[in-house]
Amino acid sequence: MAKNKFNTSWLHDHINDPYVKMAQREGYRARAAYKLKEIDEQDKLIRPGQVIVDLGAAPGSWSQYVRNKLSQGKHRDAQREGGIDGTIIALDLLPMEPIADVHFIQGDFREDNVLAQLEEVVGDRDVDLVISDMAPNLSGVAVADAARIEHVCDLALEFAQNHLKPDGALLVKCFHGSGYSQIVEKFKHQFKTVAARKPKASRDKSSETFILGRHLKRPR
């Protein structure tokens, strides 16, 4: 009974969520697009001509937002071609419906064959921005969940260290709780500037927080 009551309450909140309604109206696949939008508007992360990698991209709302942003500021040549001014690579273990102008690679970004596909798209350019909305499956056991969250953040940090340009940026989702301070310290070890962001589009009951790191301390 309690579970059914919880599900009914969540469904009611979801249906009446203004960001859900806005996403449906504006064609985004998930309300998460507005979290990235708010952070981008505050921190000016996305600019024309950039190479941007979206980790854990499915269902694709973050890539949709980036695509829309890069199409607004595109050069005249890109406009004639109907494309975007920049490069977007989305990666996920799960399948994702195609998005115009977004290169999607399905697979584990730690594996050589996936990295080879990424490098084929990127060429000899370094990545300007890595964004990650990845989240592990949580068990409700605090210690276990903290380890899983930290592991996902570690994967994004390692990817950023290997692929970002020196003045690049990494934005990842994490959760307040056990292990949060350790994740922040890892960001501070790797980046010159670190900030936490809690966009209004994050649900009030959610402990999710986004950590932004800029300018690598030890670029490869």
Swiss-Prot record:
The active site is at K173. SUPFAM superfamilies: S-adenosyl-L-methionine-dependent methyltransferases (SSF53335). It is an enzyme of class 2 (transferase). It comes from the Bacteria. It catalyses: uridine(2552) in 23S rRNA + S-adenosyl-L-methionine = 2'-O-methyluridine(2552) in 23S rRNA + S-adenosyl-L-homocysteine + H(+). Its EC number is 2.1.1.166. S-adenosyl-L-methionine binds at G60, W62, D92, D108, D133. Belongs to the class I-like SAM-binding methyltransferase superfamily. RNA methyltransferase RlmE family. This is Ribosomal RNA large subunit methyltransferase E. The gene is rlmE.
